[in-house]
């Protein structure tokens, strides 16, 4: 059980395996096959990504990096990342994972935490801490000298991230607010086994092949322009002809089959 444990659940709260139990409690062990265990793996993978970004792009500012359905993401204040950048980041992440850095949790009083992140020149982390109540103990995680503001929980070491892939990058706004800073979001996914990752990536590729956006462009049915926006397709004569045929077919069905 110790080999597959990712975290613990103490009285309903998911915690690190390093958590000291100093009183009677209800304890459950969370493994990599559990949904919560997969979240912990992916959360740790996001921290590994952030560490890799800071190594290869020292001027990048870190913001937030949660586990999400099917994977994780991390937002950075930096210029857009290319596919080559993502490949280089993957290689750096593999180094970090192989090095097996321990993820060590520590806390600081709120004012010390603000000063700590100011000294590291991480303004987004400072903003997050400043919104927390006075007197709050602020938790951080250190892995090989990379430190991130985080409530956790995390794996014991970076070696626990066994199978991952950076899937894409896109633009995002800080706090999801278009009036705030533009950020670059890197998406990734992680699984406990390489076979699970391979199966997931094959499903992604299959979905891309059947993507109506991709197929419609390749068939010359529509296009988009940045001035109008990517969410509003402009149909070509060929695409317009197809729509008219579909409309007539539906009208015939309504009249002949459905009676209205």
Summary of predicted features, one role per range:
Residues 69:
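NTP-dependent nucleotidyl-transfer catalytic core
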Residues 11-17:
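Short alpha-helix capping/helix-loop boundary micro-motifs
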Residues 4, 19-40, 61-65, 73-260:
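Auxiliary tRNA-acceptor-end handling modules of aminoacyl-tRNA synthetases
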Residues 51, 55:
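Metal-associated gating/positioning segment near the N- to mid-region
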């Amino acid at each position: 059980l110790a080999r597959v444990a990712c975290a613990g659940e103490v009285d309903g709260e998911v915690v690190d395996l390093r958590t000291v139990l100093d009183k009677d409690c209800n304890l459950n062990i969370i493994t990599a096959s559990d949904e919560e265990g997969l979240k912990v793996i992916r959360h740790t993978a996001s921290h590994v990504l952030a560490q890799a970004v800071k190594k290869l792009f020292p001027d990048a500012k870190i913001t937030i990096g949660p586990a999400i359905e099917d994977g994780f993401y991390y937002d950075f204040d930096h210029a857009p990342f290319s596919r080559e950048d993502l490949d280089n980041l993957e290689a750096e992440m593999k180094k970090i994972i192989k090095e097996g850095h321990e993820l060590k949790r520590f806390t600081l009083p709120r004012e010390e935490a603000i000063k700590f992140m100011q000294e590291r020149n991480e303004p987004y982390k400072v903003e997050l801490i400043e919104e927390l109540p006075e007197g709050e103990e602020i938790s951080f995680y250190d892995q090989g000298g990379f430190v991130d503001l985080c409530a956790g929980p995390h794996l014991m070491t970076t070696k626990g991230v066994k199978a991952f892939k950076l899937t894409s990058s896109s633009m995002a706004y800080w706090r999801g607010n278009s009036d705030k800073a533009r950020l670059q979001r890197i998406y990734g996914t992680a699984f406990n086994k390489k076979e699970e990752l391979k199966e997931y990536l094959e499903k992604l590729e299959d979905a891309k092949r059947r993507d109506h956006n991709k197929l419609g462009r390749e068939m010359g049915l529509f296009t988009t322009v940045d001035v109008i926006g990517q969410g509003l397709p402009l149909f070509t004569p060929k695409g317009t002809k197809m729509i008219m045929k579909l409309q007539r077919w539906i009208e015939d069905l309504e009249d002949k089959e459905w009676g209205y």
